[in-house]
């Protein structure tokens, strides 16, 4: 794609930020990842509990749930911890539900057995795209947790049916662009988050016009950008999971 506008980052319109996925980042969790989308950094852990929520008791299947949070100084100015305020914001609840839905879309929960996979995504530095980075990193953490279940004989086959990743796209200065950082996200005309599977299925599309409505052609261009970006992210997930000796 030709870059007809100057992005604040200097990237091409279809260029991702530098993406890094570091596995086994913490000691105790069955799966843990540091995922970096440029200056956005998120620690994702996957923990196994040998129980399920009450609504699934005696149903013969497992559950996957997610929590999301940000360190007080993950952004330009300090924010109080939500625990100190006594409640989660609507944004936090929306994002953690999105992460859970995204991962459940590629899990056969019956194969997980009567156990719960808890996903925790903690943003240590935010520069746009924290929810998409969280989904992309959390999948790798979940994959490692499942590998632990397989290695210890607690499940017979993997419940994971496909890969899943997410990316942001938007219309900035009239041009569809991929993987918005904070400067772009705060100034764009359209902001969209897209979650897709490795097979190309859409799990979720969240799109909003920031004052200027977007056209069907612009939406199609954004989805094409997102699809290509997610293919690249899934290739990075696979490369991370193929690394030995970690």
From Swiss-Prot:
Phosphate binds at residues 91, 129-131. SUPFAM superfamilies: Ribonuclease PH domain 2-like, Ribosomal protein S5 domain 2-like. InterPro entries: ExoRNase_PH_dom1 (IPR001247), ExoRNase_PH_dom2 (IPR015847), ExoRNase_PH_dom2_sf (IPR036345), PNPase/RNase_PH_dom_sf (IPR027408), Ribosomal_Su5_D2-typ_SF (IPR020568), RNase_PH (IPR050080), RNase_PH_bac-type (IPR002381), RNase_PH_CS (IPR018336). GO terms for molecular function: 3'-5'-RNA exonuclease activity; tRNA binding; tRNA nucleotidyltransferase activity. Keywords: Nucleotidyltransferase, RNA-binding, rRNA processing, Transferase, tRNA processing, tRNA-binding. Phosphorolytic 3'-5' exoribonuclease that plays an important role in tRNA 3'-end maturation. Removes nucleotide residues following the 3'-CCA terminus of tRNAs; can also add nucleotides to the ends of RNA molecules by using nucleoside diphosphates as substrates, but this may not be physiologically important. Probably plays a role in initiation of 16S rRNA degradation (leading to ribosome degradation) during starvation. Belongs to the RNase PH family. Homohexameric ring arranged as a trimer of dimers. This is Ribonuclease PH. The lineage of its organism: Bacteria, Pseudomonadati, Pseudomonadota, Betaproteobacteria, Burkholderiales. The gene is rph.
